[in-house]
Amino acid sequence: MGEVQREKVAVIIGPTAVGKTKLSIDLAKALNGEIISGDSMQIYRTMDIGTAKVTKAEMDGIPHYMIDIKNPEDSFSVAEFQERVRKHIREITERGKLPIIVGGTGLYIQSVLFDYQFTDDAGDVIYREQMEKLALERGVEYVHKKLQEVDPESAERIHANNVRRVIRALEIFHMTGEKMSDQIEKQEKELLYDVSLIGLTMDREMLYDRINLRVDLMMEQGLLEEVEGLYNRGIRDCQSIQAIGYKEIYDYFENRASLEDAVSQLKTNSRRYAKRQLTWFRNKMDVTWFDVTDGEKTSEILRYIEGKLQVKSNNSK
């Protein structure tokens, strides 16, 4: 029997503010593609400005998926993301189109492309509740330290403030005796799709300037009012509010920071996030990088995808 033909997928990754949105739409037009957002926060409705969500005008008629599918108070997991995106890939391919995943949330994108398996069981609820209680009583750093003791690699990757994921890693070790980082390493070996993995990068100072300008533009567009709307709805300890762009402005509404300091912190956190994104992609994924410091590389990237996936663009007919 011949080898089963794998579905073709183009993936565009890179740090925040590097120019992924425009490139993805240009490529979708040229390659008869449809776009799947690979951003873990653009799934939330009414959180448009702070997540730099693509607008209807920017979409220019290109179908987009995994945007506005949850309310801000809803939780969302990597496992659900994986399941939904794989379904979209299948359906887009069946329509004779090319799925194009665009985004910056490394683990989410990786979970789709590789053989990541998430347990369906509820886990150890009693153990999880014990850890949640410890986090409340003794602080998140205490629970993070427990993870460092049993799984230092996961502790390095998961920030102490991401309590849910810290506890999940502890729970996996408690239940299986196996480190979450070891499980992930096993699952990172084989791609499930025929993938063209494109990364955009640019001069760091230029990128940081773009990030600072983007934050200023967000404030002009009404980020303060957007966050105030969420705050007034009583949305507090939700996964969505941990997003950069929201937690900083929440500090202002809760009188923990002046507006000037909150905006400054937002810029700092965005720059740090961009740096972490680049580190993740370089360490974890086999990316072909294109430096866009001196301008767009759309034609060059298009030619690369055509060769890698053996597809034809509208331009090459």
Swiss-Prot record:
Residues 39-42 are annotated as: Interaction with substrate tRNA. It is an enzyme of class 2 (transferase). ATP binds at residues 14-21. Its EC number is 2.5.1.75. InterPro entries: Dimethylallyltransferase, IPT, P-loop_NTPase. It comes from the Bacteria. Its cofactor is Mg(2+). SUPFAM superfamilies: P-loop containing nucleoside triphosphate hydrolases. One of its GO terms (molecular function) is tRNA dimethylallyltransferase activity. Substrate binds at residues 16-21. Keywords: ATP-binding, Magnesium, Nucleotide-binding, Transferase, tRNA processing. It catalyses: adenosine(37) in tRNA + dimethylallyl diphosphate = N(6)-dimethylallyladenosine(37) in tRNA + diphosphate. GO terms for biological process: tRNA modification. The record marks 105, 128 as: Interaction with substrate tRNA. Monomer. Belongs to the IPP transferase family. Catalyzes the transfer of a dimethylallyl group onto the adenine at position 37 in tRNAs that read codons beginning with uridine, leading to the formation of N6-(dimethylallyl)adenosine (i(6)A). This is tRNA dimethylallyltransferase. It comes from Bacillus cereus (strain B4264). The gene is miaA.
